Amino acid sequence: VQRAPNVQVYSRHPAENGKPNFLNCYVSGFHPPQIDIELLKNGVKIENVEQSDLSFNKDWSFYLLVHTEFTPNNKNEYSCRVKHVTLKEPMTVKWDRDY
C-alpha cells in the first residue's frame, strides 16, 4: 500500500530576523520508505543538511526529520521539496515564519 507524505516546515524557535535558528522539515505518513527530501533557500538546494534516521509508526508508515541551521531575514525564502513515488511531481512546501 502506497501512502503520500505529509510535509511540515517550521523553525525550532520563533523566527527573529538576524537571530540564528534551525529550519526543520518533518515528513511523515509515507510508504514505501524511499524518499528524497531537500531544504531550499530561494529555490536552491541547501547543502550539508542533517537527517534523522528513518523511523516508522505502528502502522508501518515512515517519518523523517531533515534540518539545518539558518538565520531568518526578510529577503530569503525557505522551503522543503519532497520527491516520492506517490507524487506525480515534487511537492514543495514553503516555510511560513508565523507557523
UniProtKB/Swiss-Prot annotation:
Q: Which family does it belong to?
A: Belongs to the beta-2-microglobulin family.
Subcellular location per UniProt equals: Secreted
Species this chain originates from = Oryctolagus cuniculus
Q: Which InterPro entries match?
A: B2Microglobulin, Ig-like_dom, Ig-like_dom_sf, Ig-like_fold, Ig/MHC_CS, Ig_C1-set, MHC/Immunoglobulin
Q: Which residues does the UniProt record annotate as the domain Ig-like C1-type?
A: 5-92
Q: List cellular component terms (GO).
A: extracellular region; MHC class I protein complex
| Keywords in alphabetical order | Disulfide bond, Immunity, Immunoglobulin domain, MHC I, Secreted
The role this protein plays is: Component of the class I major histocompatibility complex (MHC). Involved in the presentation of peptide antigens to the immune system.
Report the Pfam families cross-referenced here: C1-set (PF07654)
Q: Does the keyword Disulfide bond apply?
A: yes
Query: Which cysteines share a disulfide bond?
Result: C25-C80
Which domain of life, per UniProt? Eukaryota
Q: How does it assemble?
A: Heterodimer of an alpha chain and a beta chain. Beta-2-microglobulin is the beta-chain of major histocompatibility complex class I molecules.
Spell out the protein name for this chain: Beta-2-microglobulin
User: Example GO biological process term?
Assistant: immune response
Extract the PROSITE patterns matched here.
Answer: IG_LIKE (PS50835), IG_MHC (PS00290)
